[in-house]
């Protein structure tokens, strides 16, 4: 505290705390309560950022909404998001990150959500949590942390979440066989038609309805960076930039979208999926098989784990992929670039710009 005071300008107000992080979190909770805004908290193995983006776009014409920006979704970022909300904010849409047990519980305690949303559960961070059941239990900390009478939105028929559901919550299953399905998107004009993005939109619609908002018309969605945006590159090359994260679920969804939407040759540059635990090799081999089944014409594997993809070309790292790829492409190609964030495949995209 003395050092902070010494470094501060003479006219500055210095708040000293023995535990600055705990103080930041308590300030965020106090401001959340003072705002009186409705809080929607989103987590899941895949799709949480896209779902957050779609939900914020659905709410914006109806309510003064503040949503998580960039990756401010941690024990530091979430309080900063809450504290960034100006007076008069009516809805907070918060993304909750998770890399271990107890983290979702901590973020739920800080944000005190009125609506919880779990997009899905899959083999993500298994290396840290031991099993997919452990992943489900960590995500379900959101369910445990809601106040009685709150709304909880879950994927319909997900057996891994069933033991964690609560009778004193309004549980809304979404997706095939659920209370809301893709049919409920009729009448909405969405700027995407991929299957996984439409499923995210169904979950977002359920959250909007949970707070009394009925979206309509065109939904103007601005997706967060490096999460599946299409970019037109010189030489009539289309790049799908999806470099922020990767796991078996999101890899399959991205490959399925490539199969459905690419009019010309399909090229996939796929890097390592991290934190998959002892089954990592099997997961990577399965993705290689899925890529072939999806009609990928040229498959480039990046990283040691991705050697198991049985690709046409295997390279050690992003720099090698960036050097190789331009020579493999032809006008009209669509290129999917996807890996876990730590692989840095945005460098491949930059090489094509």
Stretches found by the model and what they are:
Residues 16, 21-156, 160-168, 350-351:
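Phosphate-binding loop of NTP-binding sites
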Residues 314-317, 332-350:
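Peripheral docking tails and interdomain loops at the edges
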Residues 109, 322-329:
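Short amphipathic alpha-helix with an adjacent loop that forms part of the alpha/beta core around
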Residues 5-12, 115-238, 263-264, 289-298, ...:
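Acidic, Mg2+-coordinating active-site environments of NTP-dependent enzymes
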Residues 224, 235, 243-314, 318, ...:
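Active-site beta-alpha connecting loops in nucleotide-dependent enzymes
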Residues 24-27, 55, 59, 81-82, ...:
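Buried hydrophobic packing segments
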Residues 14-19, 313-321:
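Short acidic-hydrophobic, aromatic-tinged amphipathic segments that line or gate anion-handling sites
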